[in-house]
Amino acid sequence: MDSLNDIIDHQTFSQELVEDASEFITVGHHSERPSQSSQQPNSGQDLTMSMQDIISCPVKHRTCSASGSGSASGSDSVVMVIDALGQGNRQSAYQIVPQQLQQRNMPLPFGLLERDRQHMQHGREVNTSPVDFVSSDINLDGLTVDADVSQTDHSQETAVKQEQKLLIVQSKSQDQSHRRIRMLVDVSSVNSGLGVHVDDMDEISSDGVGCDDEGVTLSHQHLLEQEEQFGLTSHHPHLQPHTQIIHGLHQRSTHSEMGLDNGHGEVLSVIVHSQDSDKEDCEENDDGDAEGDLENEDDDERDSRSREQLLSHSSYQTLTSVNDRLSSPGFSQTSYATLTPIQPLPPISTMSEKFAYSGHISGGDSGDTDVNGDGAGGGVVEVGEVTNQSSEATGTVSISSGNATSSVCSNNDCSSFSALSMPIGSGHLGLGVLSGVQSPFSSYEKLSSMISPPPNNYLVSCDLHSSVSGRVINSSHLQLSHNGNKKESGTHEHTHRPADVNGGKFSYTGHISRGDSVDNDVNGEKFSFSDHISGGDSGDEDANREKFIYSDHISEGENGPDVNSGTNWLQMHSEREVRLHMPVPAELEARFHISSERRTRLNVPPARGSLSRHLAPNAPICPADWKADDWKHSNAGVVSLTADMPVVVSLTPTPPPLRDDSVSGIKQNERSSPGHREQYFLDKSQEPSSVVADQCSPGINGTPQSVCVIHQQSPSALGNGFQSSSQQAKVSSCASPKGTVSSGGAVSNRIANSSDMEEINTKDLAQRISAELKRYSIPQAIFAQRVLCRSQGTLSDLLRNPKPWSKLKSGRETFRRMYKWLQEPEFQRMSALRMAAAQIPQRAPLSSGMSLGSATGPSGSTGTIPTDLDPHGGPTMIQNPLTNESDSSPASTPVTSVLVGSVVSCRRKEEPQIEQMPQPKKPRLVFTDLQRRTLQAIFKETKRPSKEMQVTIARQLGLEPTTVGNFFMNARRRSMDKWRDDDSKSTMHVAHSRQQQDEQQKDNAHTHSQSQIQDQNHSQNQAIHNSMSQDPYSNLHTTAMSPLGAFDEDADMDLELESHDFDLVDPDEHGDTNDPNGDML
């Protein structure tokens, strides 16, 4: 397969980019009004038309008033072919599409040939080069890119991830009419992060009204040929879905081949194409929505503008590559790998920060129409919507940083899943897994068999090996901005930016609907949802035409216009939250003993009665094994939850963002069927915090069930980051069935744990512990390790010198554990100590006087939530909420109280403690004869070998380097000691010889029988004897320095030394016995 380097002439770009700039991306022309007439491809001169002429299709005429930075009208498909750039700032290596196709003598698709004639007739005024390349300094796999953020006009950063080629293009343009473009990305077997600099070219992701799906994949020749065939049928909307399927399958096979050939992808093609609106699906809507067909067309226009706003607001895209599989550009059912507008990438942290799963899986007709199409600037644009027979042909914008493959769709039964959207803001980096490496999202092909047969099988799992449908409101940068700019039918204003209070975005979660669901709001503010899994027809329309991003919409059965029919409006400040909900299958109910009636609703903002609610900053942490609730009183139609989940959602904590109270008016719509609403929301905080119940609000107009919001506030007594299970939140019950919200304010109900055990008498406690240990003969080491998770020395010091409670900070936890241990029954204390070290994690709550939380609900059933740890050792569930039920009417739904028992375990310290358990002593190392002789020979040559030499010696002899180093160190010490011993012995022998001479001389003087000559001879003989006795010892001084004399007990030198010692025994003993000076020497 030819790479793009073979297709593209590297030397033509720098000139043609400036000369034919209007052919590529024309941003400097004045607003144009294209006619609706469709033009057929003409001659070869059309190849040099402008970019609008090259890749576009006739669009519906629409009046647009450009304000702010300007935009372009029409539904244009932009093709950006990105390849290795040169080393210069202005040099690149690609041509425009028609020239490439001309050089290769290949026919152009209709999408490149067809365009209104008026674009060519209208003169274009390009004052400057419309394309500005950000400085390219960083060489990345043949591509040079630099994020020049210092420039004032370059307001965005560039993000390069994992060896991907990318091109940062910024349009320098004057006023434009609205340009609405959808960007699809084809990447080959590479995870990529591409920041597309979109400043004035606001409309990058949009639906084209009446414009069919066009895509030109310039990855290789095969795809171009495929595109030709695809372009022929692209203008027949009714034939298009089947053509898309065929084209998608061919393209997948081609990309799989290309992934094998190209490795990390020599080519990166950014295909910007617009999708059709699937009007025929709109007609199949079973909602009885008479306005559906008419509004769908307008909705696509407004949705396109809303996405244009979203993109222009964030102006940051990230390319998606999923498991060497690339979704075809025209394949609307699995529009998967696309560009996602997000905030600038933050520095990569140790943990993947935030990850919002989003997708739209619809088993039936789903018509979500937005009449006025005011897309409030959100960071994520209706991510990953996969429609089966849906009228939502809205574009998918998704990111997945792992190897993910969109599942194969067979005909109209599309079982593909929605992409994973990662809203990334500063301080948040969305990665597939916690560690941030390539996450093989558990294979998406499995999802086809799991979701397709019944469209209600909605399978989502959490990355922490648990079953969960996770939603991250990535609110620090996904702040829902509600601009009140009601758009007229053709106008598009950019004045929503001031309305974005924090300029952030607001993420949305899932919509699971089974049956017909038409959701209309009172205020008509539509929260655009991502996970829309509908088994039947679902039409979401607004009355007031303001589109929003709403959280989990789960409905089952007929759901008429929820104007005031009990829809709980979730208003939330854009803080970090996790909204988790999923129907509970029967097996999970049996496992967790959850009543099939109303479940707990935790951390749900109040109903619409008060729209100025704030949620405390909460870090989203995917719970371990959490319970969701059944959405019906019966278990019929429950979404099945299996253990082998295909979708992995990674949720990790991030530091809390700054809060802005002015965003509090933002509403998040959480809907369900009017009479059947049981939801289970868990909200967990990264930091240890007590749970505060606050602002409980009844339902609205007919569903008086209560919703209690639980805040998390200041830290309380925690064990290793876990909140103690005795800390229970006292929840203010809400009793009023009226529309008003009964709020108790921020009622900070602290927990008994921290308050009861304040001011512990540490001295008395230490004495009692010492007495107990002596009474039962409990070793301090066992007690310290198994109960306190401390060492024996620490316990001994604490018992001997306990500090006053007021002077303790982190050390209070140890005394708390002592105190709890004393409060336990005697048999429990002893059993805790007898447990094996391997059972310490299960024993820790018992020894701490805790038990895993189980609270009985109104039906008497208990719900338990086991806790777990993330791979980084941080707490997974650190919340201990207890919600109270409020029965305001017979129809009200009781809220089951759930106690999450926090495990106060010393798991972090256990592992080192277990490793520090006494181990059997290592056997004494004995050198073999070869090793010993080799080491001694080397020591004779060099007393201090270098580290490298020691390593070499150890490798040659099969020893450890430390062993070799110890040998040489010991050899030096022993040689010095031997030298000193031998030197002292020789000195003593010389002195003793002189003493013998003196004595003999005295004896000779007294003996007159001996002559003078005999005395002289005797002295001479004595001197000769002395010299003979000194010679071997002078030799010993040198041999003592050698390893033979130093180490070897078996060597010959040692035998010689022993013979010398034997020779010196009698004189030494004689000298010691006779001469007192001998002892001194």
UniProtKB/Swiss-Prot annotation:
Q: In which tissues is it expressed?
A: Neural-specific.
Composition bias, Acidic residues: 278-301, 1047-1056
Q: Does the keyword GTP-binding apply?
A: no
Stretches with biased composition (Basic and acidic residues)? 485-499, 658-686, 995-1006, 1057-1073
Subcellular localization(s) per the UniProt record: Nucleus
What ranges are recorded for DNA binding?
751-837, 918-977
Q: Where is the composition biased (Polar residues)?
A: 311-326, 1007-1041
Gene Ontology cellular component list: nucleus
Q: What is its main location?
A: nucleus
Biological process (GO), any one = positive regulation of transcription by RNA polymerase II
Organism superkingdom: Eukaryota
Q: Entry's Gene3D superfamilies?
A: Homeodomain-like, lambda repressor-like DNA-binding domains
Positions of the UniProt region annotated as Disordered: 274-326, 481-504, 653-688, 844-875, 978-1081
MF terms in GO: DNA-binding transcription activator activity, RNA polymerase II-specific; DNA-binding transcription factor activity, RNA polymerase II-specific; RNA polymerase II cis-regulatory region sequence-specific DNA binding
Q: Compositionally biased, Low complexity: which spans?
A: 851-867
Keywords on this record? DNA-binding, Homeobox, Nucleus, Transcription, Transcription regulation
Is the Flavoprotein keyword given for this protein? no
User: What family, per the record?
Assistant: Belongs to the CUT homeobox family.
Record's function text: Transcriptional regulator. Binds and recognize ATTG sites.
Annotated protein name in UniProt: Homeobox protein onecut
Q: Which species?
A: Drosophila melanogaster (Fruit fly)
